[in-house]
């Protein structure tokens, strides 16, 4: 599975969420990995969130989070942004 991170343009679309994502980078951990998806844990301000990457889903649904923002808005959240930034910045290694 080749994990595809989001474009910088998409990550920076909402400046407030992007800044929060930067702040959360160090709280990102890999939970588990299968052949078709990867589960990440992100410690948010108040609770632990699960971010999932689904290889087999369409591009706009590959990244999902269990937080209220993502669930209600169906838009990128700071937790998904944090995972993407951690991968892009080399703070999180995904074995291919």
Protein language model annotation of sequence segments:
Residues 1-96:
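Long, low-complexity, compositionally biased intrinsically disordered regions
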């Amino acid at each position: 599975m080749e994990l595809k991170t989001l474009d910088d343009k998409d990550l920076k679309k909402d400046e407030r969420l992007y800044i929060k994502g930067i702040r959360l980078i160090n709280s990102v951990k890999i939970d588990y990995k299968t052949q078709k998806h990867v589960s990440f844990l992100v410690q948010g301000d108040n609770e632990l969130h699960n971010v999932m990457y689904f290889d087999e889903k369409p591009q706009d649904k590959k990244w999902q989070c269990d937080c209220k923002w993502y669930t209600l808005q169906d838009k990128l959240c700071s937790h998904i942004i944090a995972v993407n930034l951690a991968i892009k910045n080399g703070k999180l290694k995904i074995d291919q």
